[in-house]
């Protein structure tokens, strides 16, 4: 099926048919390439944004859950360090180690999740280790 365009519909056409020399053709082709590329890139960007938003919506609750648990662990260790750090230097050492091991870019890295973004046992082991350590300090200082 061939679609015929009128002169009014042809946005790439010239207003002055007599001036369709080689220079104008190159300019029109270059303009067509620029607009085509821009349209292509806009389409790619739009698709990426939609997929990124969907991924964010799906995984935010999981990230928030782990962020809360990590915040609780580090917060309690910081409290124990403030209250008992002078008498028990191990508390301060544990706080420093926990802050290193539980940094968000380490916890939410690909090594702790499968292809469906479900947590692997390595993440559960890491969090359990620090939760147990906090429980030990709670028992010791309560």
From Swiss-Prot:
Family the UniProt entry places it in: Belongs to the YAE1 family.
Gene expressing this chain: YAE1
GO cellular component, one term: cytoplasm
Protein name: Protein YAE1
Subcellular location field: Cytoplasm; Nucleus
Pfam families xref list: Yae1_N (PF09811)
Function: The complex LTO1:YAE1 may function as a target specific adapter that probably recruits apo-RPLI1 to the cytosolic iron-sulfur protein assembly (CIA) complex machinery. May be required for biogenesis of the large ribosomal subunit and initiation of translation.
Region (deca-GX3 motif): 39-79
Positions with biased composition (Acidic residues): 1-10
The entry's keywords: Cytoplasm, Nucleus
Main location: cytoplasm
Subunit comment: May form a complex with LTO1.
GO biological process terms, semicolon-separated: protein maturation
Region: Disordered, residue numbers: 1-24
């Amino acid at each position: 099926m061939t679609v015929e365009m009128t002169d009014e519909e042809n946005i790439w056409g010239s207003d002055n048919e007599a001036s369709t020399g080689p220079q104008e053709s190159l300019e029109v082709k270059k303009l067509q390439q620029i607009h085509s590329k821009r349209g292509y890139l806009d389409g790619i960007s739009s698709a990426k944004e939609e997929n990124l938003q969907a991924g964010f919506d799906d995984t935010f609750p999981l990230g928030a859950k782990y962020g809360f648990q990590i915040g609780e662990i580090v917060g309690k260790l910081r409290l124990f360090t403030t209250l008992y750090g002078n008498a028990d230097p191990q508390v301060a050492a544990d706080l420093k180690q926990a802050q290193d091991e539980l940094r968000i870019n380490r916890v939410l890295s690909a090594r702790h999740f499968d292809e469906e973004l479900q947590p692997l046992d390595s993440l559960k082991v890491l969090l359990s280790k620090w939760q147990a350590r906090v429980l030990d300090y709670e028992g010791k200082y309560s």
